[in-house]
A protein has these predicted regions:
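An N-terminal domain-cap segment
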Residues: 3-49
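SAM-dependent nucleic-acid methyltransferase catalytic core
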Residues: 1-17, 25, 74-187
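Conserved S-adenosyl-L-methionine
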Residues: 29-85
């Protein structure tokens, strides 16, 4: 399977629409680090590097990519997403308390993905407040229920992007890495 045709999740500041432009500005590289990974949109659309590191401070988002990295877990996530109806009741059951209490990483990923895809606006993953349930699609013809129903088809493309995880402090200690983060860290 090729590159994903849409983001792993709808995420505020996700850069999905800008990713091709951003990738075009990148120099040739062997190491790529997403220090503030979010939806990983640039990582998912760029050519693979020898070493790729994804990191984000929010463990619920990182959990999605960890689940997708394991073939058996990714398949189970696909199955659960396919069985999840696009319903307001499901949207409303996804709260920060529920996510924090959920011990099953696959279920936590399913809940987070549903919230991201069914909320109005990309800020829907901010569980501190509700942006509302997305009923209508864009003027271009996309319909939220159809987007959710077909999202599991993208799992293999997202999974094949090859995401590795490192603590942020380890990322910044790579001697050959030049990034805004390393410039800030080393003044």
């Amino acid at each position: 399977m090729g590159k994903p045709r849409r983001p792993a999740l709808r995420y505020h500041g996700g850069k999905w629409l800008l990713a091709a432009w951003i990738v075009g500005l990148m120099p040739a590289h062997h190491i790529y680090v997403e220090t503030h990974g979010g939806a990983g949109s640039v990582l998912l659309q760029k050519p693979r590097a020898d070493t790729e590191v994804y990191n984000d401070v929010w463990n619920h988002v990182v959990n999605i990519f960890k689940v997708l990295r394991d073939p058996a877990r990714a398949e189970e996530l696909r199955r659960r997403c396919e069985l999840t109806p696009y319903a307001r009741a499901v949207f409303e059951e996804v709260t920060l308390e529920r996510l924090d209490a959920e011990r099953d990483p696959i279920e936590r990923a399913r809940l987070m993905l549903f919230r991201a895809w069914s909320g109005f606006g990309s800020g829907s993953v901010n569980l501190a407040h509700s942006t509302g349930f997305r009923i209508r699609g864009r003027r271009s013809g996309g319909h939220p229920a159809r987007e959710w129903a077909t999202w599991p088809e993208e799992i293999e493309a997202v999974r094949s992007a090859g995401v590795e995880f490192e603590p942020a402090t380890r990322q910044l200690e790579i001697p050959s890495l030049t990034s805004c983060a390393s410039e800030v860290a080393h003044g």
